[in-house]
């Protein structure tokens, strides 16, 4: 991947409540590889979308795990 190339990573999560969202927010906000992120709580899968540079899905899954959040990559 080109150093300047952005990638969108998409995950199914259990970010159903504001409290769960607050648990992961510091991890995502402070990570240098994450450009921006959002959660679609209107989707049944509480989809987490991350715009990143040089991050693998496993990196995000590990961040979520560290925050106590369930997270799995959604296929394209």
Question: What would you call each of these model-derived segments?
Answer:
Residues 14-32:
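Short amphipathic alpha-helix segments
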Residues 5, 19, 38:
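Solvent-exposed, flexible loop/coil residues
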Residues 44-46, 51, 59:
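Short, charge-rich amphipathic interface segments used for partner binding and complex assembly
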Residues 12-15, 49-54:
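Short beta-strand-to-loop capping motifs
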